[in-house]
Design a protein with these regions (language model features):
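Active-site and donor-binding regions of nucleotide-sugar-utilizing enzymes
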Residues: 1-84, 215-218, 233-236
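Short, well-ordered alpha-helix to beta-strand connector turns
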Residues: 27, 45-49, 160-161, 223, ...
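Catalytic donor nucleotide-activated moiety binding site of glycosyltransferases and closely related
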Residues: 129-137, 150-213
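A donor-sugar binding/catalytic signature common to diverse glycosyltransferases
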Residues: 213-247
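A nucleotide-sugar donor-handling region in carbohydrate enzymes
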Residues: 63-134
Length: 247
């Protein structure tokens, strides 16, 4: 079985990885195809191929060359074989059963158990703030934690927690159709919270052998407190249990 998942990050975590992991635990031979630095999400795949390309903006997954769900940029209803009364629009899904694919083939990978470690341990309990600031829907940023709110969060949490701020830079992750932007959050931390809030990029020096996504996984596995924003950010945080406040 060949599983090809080149869509957005959040869709990868909710569709591709659980489908592939289900094949793994059931002894099905499979290979996975994805973008760069996705092996951490498919640690169980012995045959994982990474392509040097951007992620597609759509929600899609191909299994043995055929769409497992309809290629589209909205997730609502996409797991159904028929998406409208016009069957001509969905002839490429005629091979699918009339049910949700995850009824019997959806098992989320145990990221927390697999990546739990004794390396990223700190004097205070971890609190990870996962943010983004990027173009969305052919417009400006929509889903993000603004500077005023970040300031309040940092002020509230830093006395009692090891606060790690995670907003990836373009050099850290594979981008999709969105453009990552700056908005002064790093300056806020550097000018007001130096020594109290740690950028995830600054932790890379502790383990330079890790890729950015590996670093995220090992950190998150030791954390049970998250604040995130809608999208792949919140999906990844939710994999690790504890409390995830989606802003």
């Amino acid at each position: 079985m060949k599983i090809e998942m080149l869509g957005e990050f959040g869709y990868d975590l909710t569709l591709g990885a659980p489908f592939a992991y289900h094949q793994y635990i059931n002894g099905v031979e499979f290979e996975t195809i994805n973008v760069k630095d996705t092996k951490p999400f498919y640690f169980f795949s012995e045959k994982h191929k990474e392509l040097d390309m951007k992620r597609d903006m759509c929600y899609e997954m191909k299994v043995d060359g055929k769409y497992r769900v309809k290629r589209h940029n909205h997730s609502v209803g996409l797991h159904w074989k028929t998406l409208s009364h016009d069957k001509n629009l969905h002839e490429d899904l005629d091979h699918l059963p009339d049910k949700l694919f995850w009824h019997d083939q959806w098992t989320p990978p145990p990221y927390s158990a697999y990546y739990k470690n004794n390396f990223f341990r700190f004097e205070k309990p971890l609190y990870i703030i996962s943010n983004k600031y990027q173009s969305e829907w052919d417009g400006g940023p929509v889903n993000f934690i603004d500077l005023e709110t970040l300031d309040k969060i940092f002020e509230m949490l830093s006395p009692n927690f090891k606060v790690i701020y995670n907003r990836p830079k373009p050099s850290n992750i594979v981008e999709d159709h969105s453009t990552l932007m700056d908005f002064g959050d790093f300056d806020l931390i550097g000018n007001k919270y130096k020594g109290r809030v740690t950028l995830i990029q600054d932790l890379q020096s502790m383990a330079p052998q890790l890729s950015f996504n590996e670093l995220q996984m090992y950190l998150y596995a030791n954390c049970s407190n998250f604040i995130s924003v809608q999208g792949g950010n919140s999906v990844l945080c939710s994999y690790f249990g504890g409390k995830n406040i989606v802003y």
